[in-house]
Amino acid sequence: MRIGLFGGSFDPIHLGHLLAASQAQEVLCLDRVLFVVAARPPHKVPVAPAEARYEMTLLAVAEDPRFTVSRLELDRPGPSYTVDTLRKARRLFPQDELFFITGADAYRDVLTWKEGERLPEYATLVAVARPGYPLEEAPLPVVPLFVPEVGISSTEIRRRLKEGRSVRYWVPRAVEVYIEKHGLYR
């Protein structure tokens, strides 16, 4: 099988993430895409708790059989290092072809990650192209994934929510309801 591991904070997950996952699944002929929610990313501090981000991601992908949500990082103590996640995934899926998918902005600093230079040993690296982050400058070989630009970011969604503005059509409706119910990002 060909499995995509889509890593991110998903703080919150939004339609841009889902579009990127769908594009990755189609372009790379993936049998499935596992959303890997970062529990404790070492390079940034999430706003919402890990379990809330996990639950929102579950809600976001519930109706798409191509997508599942993984607890690979959530059930492991300590910081969420990508190399540890990929090692664990390689043990879980020893015969499968793995693709690690994340934004081009993240790959810019991949060599500062714990054992970042070793990531290609465990999975093919796939970078979702973003304006301002040329993939030619990526420090490790990556497969570029071009996704239509939607101009949606988790940062902008959190800002809008803090200002009391709507995020309808920015996130799946179930995620919007979850955010409202739990008073997140206020």
Curated annotation (Swiss-Prot):
Its EC number is 2.7.7.18. Keywords: ATP-binding, NAD, Nucleotide-binding, Nucleotidyltransferase, Pyridine nucleotide biosynthesis, Transferase. One of its GO terms (biological process) is NAD biosynthetic process. The keyword Transmembrane does not apply. NCBIfam families: cyt_tran_rel, nicotinate (nicotinamide) nucleotide adenylyltransferase, PRK00071.1-3. Catalyzes the reversible adenylation of nicotinate mononucleotide (NaMN) to nicotinic acid adenine dinucleotide (NaAD). This is Probable nicotinate-nucleotide adenylyltransferase. It comes from Thermus thermophilus (strain ATCC BAA-163 / DSM 7039 / HB27). The gene is nadD.
